[in-house]
Curated annotation (Swiss-Prot):
Signal peptide range in chain numbering: 1-21
Family note: Belongs to the thaumatin family.
BP GO annotations: defense response to fungus; killing of cells of another organism
Positions of transmembrane segments: none
CDD domains assigned to the protein according to its UniProt record, in alphabetical order: TLP-P
UniProt xrefs under SUPFAM superfamilies: Osmotin, thaumatin-like protein
Job of this protein: Associated with resistance against stem rust fungi.
PROSITE patterns associated with the record: THAUMATIN_1, THAUMATIN_2
UniProt keyword annotations, A-Z: Antimicrobial, Fungicide, Pathogenesis-related protein, Plant defense, Signal
Lineage: Eukaryota, Viridiplantae, Streptophyta, Embryophyta, Tracheophyta
Protein name per the record: Thaumatin-like pathogenesis-related protein 2
Gene3D superfamilies per UniProt: Thaumatin
Length: 169
C-alpha cells in the first residue's frame, strides 16, 4: 500500500511539474475605467485608471481571449457596455463587438498569442510574452493584428511564460 501511494505521489508530482499556469498581468493606462473580460478564464471585472490585476490561466487553455470593455454600467452583475459588451454580463462567457482582442493558447512547451481586430477595434493595446515579441495595436489598422481570418499574425512563446496586456499604452 505504501509503495502504490509513493508511486501515485511521484506521478502526480511529475505531471504537475510539466503543466504550469501562465500569469497574465493586465494594466489599465487609460484615463478612464476599463472592464477587462476573458474567456474561458477571467470572466470580467472593473479596472480603474492606472490599476493592474493578475489572472492565472492554466496550462492546456486554448482559444483564450481577453479584451477591455468601455463605457460600462453594472448593477448586481448585470448591465451594459458601450464597447466589448458580452450580453450584459459582468462575467463573460462570450466576447462582444467591437473589441480589440488579446488571443492565446497556453500549451505545454510552446504557447501561441496574437492581437485580433477582426471583431472590431475599441482600445489601444500592447500584448507581450515574457519570452517573445511585444505586439502593439494603437488603431484599427495596426500591423501587428489579425484583420482577416486568413492573416498570419500568430506568435509563438516558450511554455511557462507570463504575459502582459496593457490598455492605452
Amino acid at each position: 500500500m505504501a509503495t502504490s501511494s509513493a508511486v501515485l505521489f511521484f506521478l502526480l508530482a511529475v505531471f504537475a511539474a510539466g503543466a504550469s499556469a501562465a500569469t497574465f498581468r493586465i494594466t489599465n493606462n487609460c484615463g478612464f475605467t476599463v472592464w477587462p473580460a476573458g474567456i474561458p478564464v477571467g470572466g470580467g471585472f472593473q479596472l480603474n485608471s492606472k490599476q493592474s490585476s493578475n489572472i492565472n490561466v492554466p496550462a492546456g487553455t486554448s482559444a483564450g481571449r481577453i479584451w477591455g470593455r468601455t463605457g460600462c454600467s453594472f448593477n448586481n452583475g448585470r448591465g451594459s457596455c458601450a464597447t466589448g459588451d458580452c450580453a450584459g454580463a459582468l462575467s463573460c462567457t462570450l466576447s462582444g463587438q467591437p473589441a480589440t482582442l488579446a488571443e492565446y493558447t497556453i500549451g505545454g512547451s510552446q504557447d501561441f498569442y496574437d492581437i485580433s481586430v477582426i471583431d472590431g477595434y475599441n482600445l489601444a493595446m500592447d500584448f507581450s510574452c515574457s519570452t517573445g515579441v511585444a505586439l502593439k495595436c494603437r488603431d484599427a489598422n495596426c500591423p501587428d493584428a489579425y484583420h482577416h481570418p486568413n492573416d498570419v499574425a500568430t506568435h509563438a512563446c516558450n511554455g511557462n511564460s507570463n504575459y502582459q496586456i496593457t490598455f492605452c499604452p
